[in-house]
A protein has these predicted regions:
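Membrane-proximal helix-turn-helix segments that form the acceptor-binding/catalytic region
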Residues: 140-158
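Short hydrophobic beta-strand element within catalytic cores of glycosyltransferases
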Residues: 300-303
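Conserved acidic donor-binding segment of nucleotide-sugar-dependent glycosyltransferases
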Residues: 315-316, 320-327, 336-341
Length: 379
């Protein structure tokens, strides 16, 4: 089978045009790792860029890479039509069996549905939900992304829903859905945890209202002041926002807090190794990678009972869940984990087994092939 994967090259997104090798979002990257283990498939990764960059022709023996430069006018101002048309011309030359657009945040979904080939989309962030929550106030980004998401949902052959939450959001708009979680980068399965002597809680995510880091600090303040734990925050945010300023004020006034900023995947692996537990107090999420990655790394995971999280965690079996609106539940969950080593060990072991069984890259890649075959068989 010949497959086109449309995904964002984060060199372009982050302004790292000097790098000579592409890097992608954690979920698409892990999926490509899985495809690399299936030699009888041919994968072509296409990423649009606003500047020319040096790039390898192949990412693996069976995975080709195409960096496609598109002029500035072909991006958001044209509703990504320039990206879609340039990609369409290249896809015709490749002549794939199927096209897979990764995400509705930017250009990839439009490129897939306008490709002229059988196609599916994966919804990573639900743009219509973000727009309804009025995130990034003062910006039209989410409103535009939500409108394009709706258009693409109606035009695609189907959606790979990475959670039941997303399936329920899109199933009335799109012809077909398949429920399949993200894959996890294989490096996290190799971690051997060695937690710090003082319990270290790891938060991974954007420093903003939706992920709720301020709520986490306030809930845990008694534990932090009693020197029962520390919290490390791996992520960044809008330093001009009121939320960031409140977060920074707490960072300066409450003991035991550390801001790591945005860190590499290798550095994140080291943080998993040191962590006593991983916490995600989010108010809304689809298939949060930190939950999957923490489980793969063999670290106990506690997360909000919202969005797609209940698909990933079996409460009291391979993780713990809580209500993010109730600070006492966040605090009680963390207290249980930092004080009960037997509980941590049991949940970490079960979580790791779940990750190997359900989130390993090769397993997820093979299930994607089944989805592609479903699409082709229905034509």
């Amino acid at each position: 089978m010949r497959i086109v994967q449309l995904t964002t090259d984060n060199r372009n997104q982050h302004g790292r045009w000097d790098l000579e090798h592409p890097y992608f979002g954690t979920a698409p990257e892990a999926l490509l790792q899985g495809f690399a283990e299936i030699p009888d498939v041919e994968v072509h990764v296409i990423s649009c860029t606003s500047r020319p960059m040096k790039s390898p022709e192949k990412l693996a023996p069976n995975i080709h890479f195409h960096s496609l430069r598109v002029p500035k006018l072909g991006w958001g101002r044209s509703l990504f039509l320039g990206c879609a048309m340039a990609t369409r011309r290249l896809i015709r030359k490749i002549n794939p069996d199927i096209v897979h657009g990764q995400g509705t945040e930017r250009d990839c979904a439009m490129e897939a549905v306008l490709s002229g080939y059988p196609n599916v989309l994966t919804i990573h962030g639900n743009m219509r939900v973000h727009a309804s929550r009025e995130e990034q106030k003062g910006s039209s980004y989410y409103k535009m992304a939500a409108a394009l998401e709706t258009l693409c949902l109606k035009r695609t052959n189907g959606v790979v829903a990475i959670s039941t939450y997303t399936r329920e959001l899109v199933e009335k708009l799109t012809p077909r859905t398949w429920l399949l979680p993200n894959a996890v980068d294989r490096r996290y399965f190799k971690i051997e945890p060695a937690p710090d002597p003082l319990p270290r809680i790891l938060f991974v995510g954007a420093i903003g209202e939706r992920k709720n880091p301020v709520g986490l600090i306030k809930a845990c303040e008694p534990l932090l002041r009693a020197r029962e734990c520390t919290i490390a925050f791996a992520g960044d945010g809008d330093e001009n926002s009121a939320y960031w300023k409140e977060f920074k004020s707490l960072l300066d006034s409450v003991p035991g807090l550390e801001l790591l900023g945005f860190i590499s995947r290798d550095a994140l692996g080291e943080e998993f190794r040191r962590a006593t537990l991983v916490i995600l107090p989010t108010f809304e999420d689809n298939c949060p990678m930190v939950v999957l990655e923490g489980m793969a790394a063999g670290v106990p995971v506690a997360a909000s009972r919202v969005g797609g999280v209940p698909d990933l965690i079996r409460h009291e079996v391979d993780g713990l869940m809580f209500d993010p609106e109730k600070p006492e539940q966040i605090r009680d969950t963390i207290t249980r984990l930092i004080r009960d080593k037997e509980l941590r060990t049991r949940i970490a072991r079960a979580g790791n087994e779940t990750a190997w069984r359900q989130f390993h890259p090769k397993i997820i890649a093979e299930k994607h092939l089944g989805i592609y075959q479903d699409v082709l068989a229905a034509r």
